[in-house]
Amino acid sequence: MKRLLPVLLVLFLLASCKKNISELPPPTGTGADTFGASVNGKLWAPQKFGIMPSAEILEAHYIPDGVIINARNFASSPTESEFKFEIKGVNGPGVYSLNSENGSYAYYVERKITPTGEWQTNAQYTGTVTITTDDRTAKILAGTFQFQAASLYGDSPVTVTDGRFDVKVR
């Protein structure tokens, strides 16, 4: 038992290490369950955390008037981060605006149990989502995005570029 404890400790530490993201996933439209972006010039992708391997890190849902996409990175412990998109009026491939006028928005949060920074698109800080695949039969949604979002705490805005997603809609 004494020999097993150090081995388990090392395995736990290895499993909970953050993986550096060296490149974004390729933009695809096959339901590959991928997501990535550059947040203020730093690459971001969903990641699990060793002690929470079953937590959902990427999900999408159709809603009556659009779609919601969530992507989470739990591996940056103690700070975790998340994207949420609510895109209204999705009716196939096309360009959709992220602003407060149409009800569509992008939201990005960093938190240590409670939020330490929150940003959301609005009438002044906007962006777009370009949906390239919207296959309701196969339940695949794919596309690209970019936006600048205002801080809800009065901090500097966040700039998100080179975004891409390819998700299976639940």
Task: Provide a role label for each language-model segment.
Residues 127-170:
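C-terminal or internal capping secondary-structure element at the end of a domain, subdomain, or sheet
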Residues 45, 93, 150-153:
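Residue-level signal for secondary-structure boundary sites
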Residues 1-17:
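Sec-dependent bacterial lipoprotein signal peptides
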Residues 43, 51-138:
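Surface-exposed helix/loop patches within compact recognition domains
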Residues 26-47:
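Post-signal peptide N-terminal segment of mature Sec-exported envelope proteins
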Residues 18-24:
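Bacterial lipoprotein signal-peptidase II cleavage site
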Residues 32-34, 54, 168:
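Long, charged/polar, soluble alpha-helical segments
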